[in-house]
Amino acid sequence: MADSRETLTINAFVVGYPIKHSRSPIIHSYWLKKFGIAGSYTAVEVSPDDFPKFIATLKEGKPGAAVGGNATIPHKEAAYRLADHPDALAEELGAANTIWMEEGKLHATNTDGYGFVSNLDERHPGWDKTQRAVVFGAGGASRAVIQSLRDRDVAEIHVVNRTVERARELADRFGPRVFSHPQAALQEVMHGAGLFVNTTSLGMNGTEAPHLDFSHLAANAVVTDIVYVPLKTPILNMAQEQGIATVDGLGMLLHQAKPGFRRWFGRIPEVDETLRSLIIADMEKH
């Protein structure tokens, strides 16, 4: 007998402004097809002014309405604020990227940190044996990274930023194992670190990045970048040229999608090489 989840059309979405760049529909459509689920996952462009109305309509729960979806830039903070039940992860970050209706209430979580560490687990197993990590950048994208590293019990998380005040705010937010430094201290801070994470936009869409010397990192260190366009960012290229292991940022996008799919469609999807190749092919077209 068919699973009852598969006899009804289940609808989910990704909402952002703009949204045409989103590759989330490719990811979820791949999984829907793989499981043979009668469902849809569509990109919806909604301006910040119209977002509260969008959420209010979702909460009405009319027949055929979406069961939930992803919120991306610039709606993550608003998705958290408008949720009836944000979980502890979203609460601490002040942002949600995954929302769903349950018993008439809107629930919210943030899966960015899960995506980040799952990518490292897949592409560089054992990375979390390090006791010292360097997070380069203190913007919004760094929060989930810092949270996930702390929750994986990395002993020291050093946040380096051009304006040290931003880094200090994150150290205050995420606790005593997080330390703040100005960009001038980067080389010194890297000494003995087993993980270097770029959370800045340096190298995004082919822009140049300043030269970084990774020679002070630990012998078995890994450098990763949450930027995935281009796949091999200037920072990853620099690390490879210096003989350092690297992990690109694409897996973070793929893995962060898994909890939402499970929540909306009731199946646990896998990130495989076919899916990865689909996204890379789409990146090469645009």
UniProtKB/Swiss-Prot annotation:
The active site is at 76 (proton acceptor). The gene is aroE. Keywords: Amino-acid biosynthesis, Aromatic amino acid biosynthesis, NADP, Oxidoreductase. It comes from Agrobacterium fabrum (strain C58 / ATCC 33970). It catalyses: shikimate + NADP(+) = 3-dehydroshikimate + NADPH + H(+). This is Shikimate dehydrogenase (NADP(+)). One of its GO terms (cellular component) is cytosol. CDD domains: NAD_bind_Shikimate_DH. Involved in the biosynthesis of the chorismate, which leads to the biosynthesis of aromatic amino acids. Catalyzes the reversible NADPH linked reduction of 3-dehydroshikimate (DHSA) to yield shikimate (SA).
